[in-house]
Amino acid sequence: MTELARHESGFLLRTEEGELRSRSVLLATGVHNRRPNMSEAMHDDALSRGLLRYCPICDGYEVTDTNVAVIGSGNHGLQEALFLRGFTERVTLVAPDGVHALSEEDFSLAEDAAISLIDGPIAAITIEGDQLCLATPSGRLAFTSVYPALGSVIRSELGRSVGADLSDKGCILVDAHQRTSYQGLYAAGDVVIGLDQISHAMGEGGVAATTIRNDLANIKPLYRGRP
């Protein structure tokens, strides 16, 4: 879908194949993780081999007692490194572009957790054997797995285009039944505020589907065999 617009009976959806009309729309457009500077082919290879990972909540246990790096800085990057510290003693936080942007409190937290801090910029990322290597001003560093903590782009443009309320970070705001602020529009998954996990998104999708069915039935009874 390339465009979502309001219509007198609901919504007008434009796609590459043409236009559709719908009384209700469920947006499950998710987010796009910001990637480290590496070719798509290398990125996909590293991802398939577990050298590059994006969700420590999902698979942090798989890097137990290995040598792990987090690419990121600021409190966001540090929090991911601290989370991974629960799985392994060897965690390094590498700033992608320059010196670390950490507060005194952040530096203290990193020191207390024995997290190594490496300033960037990262000049190159390569795969060498079963390790992902980062070229930094401190030298070439090799890791069993690397987690980018570079943030994400929330794909909420379609919701914004019809006037749905968004959070300060751009997530679509919904009620307990996945309704947005615009009647007939629903949202589920990573595009709304919550835990970015498949199982959580599936649950929200189930809630949204039930809500949509019931809301449509309140407009007009849904009886089989009747137009």
Could you describe each region identified by the protein language model?
Residues 1-66, 136, 145, 172-176, ...:
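FAD-binding core/adjacent interface of flavoenzyme oxidoreductases
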Residues 72-74:
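Glycine-rich Rossmann-fold phosphate-binding loop(s) that bind the pyrophosphate
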Residues 66-67, 90:
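Residues that mark the start of a beta-strand
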Residues 43-62, 150-197, 207, 214:
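FAD-site-proximal beta/loop scaffold in flavoenzymes
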Residues 78-80, 188-227:
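A conserved FAD-binding loop/helix module that cradles the flavin
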Residues 1-8, 12-14, 19-22, 86-171, ...:
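A Rossmann-like FAD-binding core segment of flavoenzymes
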